[in-house]
Amino acid sequence: METTHRVVIGDSRDLALTEDSVDLVVTSPPYPMIEMWDDAFGSMNPAASEALADGDGDRAFEAMHAVLDDVWAELQRVLCPGGIACVNVGDATRTVDGRFRVYPNHARVLSAFESLGFDPLPDILWRKPANSAAKFMGSGMVPPSAYVTLEHEYVLVFRNGERRAFEPGATGRYEAAYFWEERNRWFSDVWTDVRGETQSLEGSEARDRSAAFPFAVPYRLINMYSVYGDTVLDPFWGTGTTSLAAMVAGRNSVGVERDPAVVETFEARAERVPDLSRSVVEGRLADHRAFVRETRDRGGSLDYEAEHYDFPVRTKQERGIRLYEAASVERADAGYRVTHRPVEEGRGS
C-alpha cells in the first residue's frame, strides 16, 4: 500500500482542491484572542487589529473568527458527503481595555459550522495542563475574584450531511477497524491520557507561529473517522502533525500552510516516520495482548478470532483488523510518498 502526502504553501481561504476530494478534516487553527496570533489575524483582516487598538474585545473576536469562517466554507466545499471534520480549538482568556473575560472560541466555531449545514456530533475534551504551576488567576487566595485556569481544549466533530456510504464488506474499512478496548477509550468524551506538545522548532519566528497539538490527538481522530486509503486535510498544517499521523495510520494527506519557514522543519520528522510507525503499531498490538490476558484472568471470554493475528477479539467487526507500518518515506512532488506493509504475526507479542 502506498500513500501520498502533499504540502501546499497557500491560503486556506482559497483551497486549490476540487469539490468532495477529501474524506476527513483534522485541524487545529490559530485561536482568536490569543495574543500570539494577533498579527496573523490582523494581516488577514485589518478590522481585528483596529478593534484591539480601540479596546473593543468583542469586535476583535468577531473579526478574527470572520477569517476562520472563510476557511470553514472551503471545507464544506472540498469535504465529501458524509465526511467528518474535527476541529481542535481552545477558548481564550484575555484582558482588553481593563476587563478580563473568556472568549468562547469553541462556541463560535460550532455556530459557524452549523450555519454551513454541518451536523454537530458529540465533542471531546482533552486535558492540556497549563505551563504555570499556579492553578488560579486573579486575586490569589482571597475570594471572590480569582479565575479558573483553562486546562482543556475541545475537539469539535462535524459531519457533512448524511452518513457516509460504503460498499458492503469494503476491505479498507474492515482492515481499519480498531480494538474494542481502543473504542472505549477513544470514544470517551474526556481524554486525560494525552498531553500538550512542547515546541522545538528552529528559529524564533517559526516557533512563535506554531500551534501544534500532540500526535495522539490526530492519530486517534484519523483512526476513528477514516479508513485506509482515505485523504485527510489539515488547512492549518503548522508543524505537520496531522500529516505525520496520517503517514503512520495509512491514510493520504494534504496540508496547507502560509509560512514556508514552518514547512521546512517537517523533513526531519518525516524521516523518523518508519520508527514512529513501528513503535505505534507494536504498542497497539502489545496493549491488545495485555487486554486479552487481563480479560482471561478475570474469567471473561473473547468469542472471535482475529483473521490476521493469533489472538482473540471481543467483537465480530474486529476480526478483519490489520495494522500496517510505514516501511519507507520518499520525497515526491510537493510532498512525500510512503510505502506501507502489513504487520505480520509475532510482532508486539
Task: Name these PLM-found stretches.
Residues R163-P168, R183-W186:
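Proline-centered turn/helix-capping motifs that create local helix->coil transitions or kinks
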